[in-house]
UniProtKB/Swiss-Prot annotation:
Homodimer. It catalyses: sn-glycerol 1-phosphate + NAD(+) = dihydroxyacetone phosphate + NADH + H(+); sn-glycerol 1-phosphate + NADP(+) = dihydroxyacetone phosphate + NADPH + H(+). GO terms for molecular function: glycerol-1-phosphate dehydrogenase (NAD+) activity; glycerol-1-phosphate dehydrogenase (NADP+) activity; metal ion binding. This is Glycerol-1-phosphate dehydrogenase [NAD(P)+]. It comes from Saccharolobus solfataricus (strain ATCC 35092 / DSM 1617 / JCM 11322 / P2) (Sulfolobus solfataricus). It is found in: Cytoplasm. The keyword Ubl conjugation does not apply. The gene is egsA. It is an enzyme of class 1 (oxidoreductase). GO terms for cellular component: cytoplasm. Catalyzes the NAD(P)H-dependent reduction of dihydroxyacetonephosphate (DHAP or glycerone phosphate) to glycerol 1-phosphate (G1P). The G1P thus generated is used as the glycerophosphate backbone of phospholipids in the cellular membranes of Archaea. InterPro entries: G1P_dehydrogenase_arc, G1PDH, Glycerol_DH.
Length: 351
């Protein structure tokens, strides 16, 4: 790779354990961060977690809270208004993917550090220096700030809705496809391929695959395994300086569906469906992936997510246009309507 400089953006510390939010003041002391803090959180369950974090901040710490319920540019602007007013030294993102995406993007735009405190293991954005923000030109990830630290409290994460946990598994297993697509682009287009970062992403996928054997028996152990996989995937992106190790044709399909059917479906759920479909195209055993996901209660049919056959087929035909510079198994021309329909039926995504 003939570039003058390659910057690797990684978290300084990762704290994983049980009931560790009660030790947040100790962690902040270790990190050398001081008030004032700006806390970004959700409006419902995550706000309760944020309140617990606030109770354990350093004594007399000055802070302000912003509550959001989406990840749009308007939400980012709302956070930035408070940044201008209180000049915080640190942002804390306490919530799910939307909260953390808004926090890291606002931190990036304002040259601030941020700490990621996820309340659900729904996708690998808890670690990565990229964010998905609605209101931009396309539904793809944009450059954002990597977290200074991650505080992953397994007690909190294991209480998140099972649907969110399953979505995290779907998102992470998708790295199997992303790495295959990356290899294909290197072979056919001469694109740079990073063996180490690809191996790290693939290891994350395999770890999540193993998680499907455990999660029904031991939720806390399974969630810890999943968190390790999500963190590793985010680190792979930070090392690569792009989302390439973690986002391929399975994500293009997910983004295409999000354009057609923008509400009510979790990102990781769509990535899981996309992984089954793209595994078929790559000649990978898609049946094993489908069966493993089905056993944990993952929705493996489009209708389970409220998607029509036509929406799935259309998404498959336009997926290659979402990010044309990123070569995948879909090629430059994508799939015809008839071939997309055939593949969706063969993989049992549609009946």
């Amino acid at each position: 790779m003939n570039v003058k400089e390659h910057v690797i953006s990684l978290p300084r510390r990762v704290f994983v354990g049980h009931d560790i939010v009660y030790d947040i003041s100790i962690y902040f002391s270790q990190l050398g961060v001081t008030p004032p803090f700006l806390i970004v959180t959700g409006t419902k369950y995550t706000k309760k977690i944020a309140d617990k974090v606030i109770e354990n901040l350093p004594k007399d710490a000055k802070y302000e809270v912003v509550e959001i319920d989406s990840a749009t540019l308007d939400d980012v602007y709302m956070v930035e208004e408070v940044i201008k007013r209180i000049s915080p030294s640190l942002l804390l993102g306490i919530g799910g993917g939307k909260v953390i995406d808004v926090t890291k993007y606002a931190a990036f735009r304002n040259s601030l550090e941020f700490v990621s405190i996820p309340t659900s293991p729904s996708h690998d954005g808890i670690t990565s220096p990229f964010a998905s923000i609605k209101g931009l030109q396309k539904p793809v990830s944009v450059k954002a700030k990597e977290p200074l630290a991650i505080i992953a409290d397994i007690e909190i994460l294991s209480l998140s809705p099972r649907r969110l946990i399953n979505a995290g598994i779907g998102d992470t297993i998708g790295k199997i496809i992303a790495v295959r697509d990356w290899k294909l682009a290197a072979k056919l287009r001469g694109e740079y391929y990073g063996d180490y970062t690809a191996s790290l992403a693939l290891m994350s996928a395999k770890h999540a695959f193993q998680c499907t054997k455990i999660i029904n028996k031991d939720i806390k152990y399974g969630v810890r395994m999943l968190m390790e996989a999500l963190i590793s995937s985010g680190v792979a992106m930070g090392m690569a300086g792009s989302t390439r190790p973690a986002s391929g044709s399975e994500h293009l399909f997910a983004h295409a569906v999000e354009l057609i059917h923008p509400e009510g479906i979790l990102h990781g759920e769509l990535v899981g469906l996309g992984t089954i479909i793209m595994a078929y195209l790559h000649g990978i055993n898609w049946k094993i992936i489908r069966n493993r996901l089905k056993k944990i209660g993952f929705p493996v049919k489009a209708k389970d997510l409220g998607l029509s056959d036509e929406e799935v087929i259309k998404a498959l035909t336009i997926a290659h246009t979402i990010r044309p510079e990123r070569y995948t198994i879909l090629g430059d021309r994508g799939l015809t309507w008839s071939s997309a329909e055939k593949i969706a039926r063969v993989t049992k995504i549609i009946d």
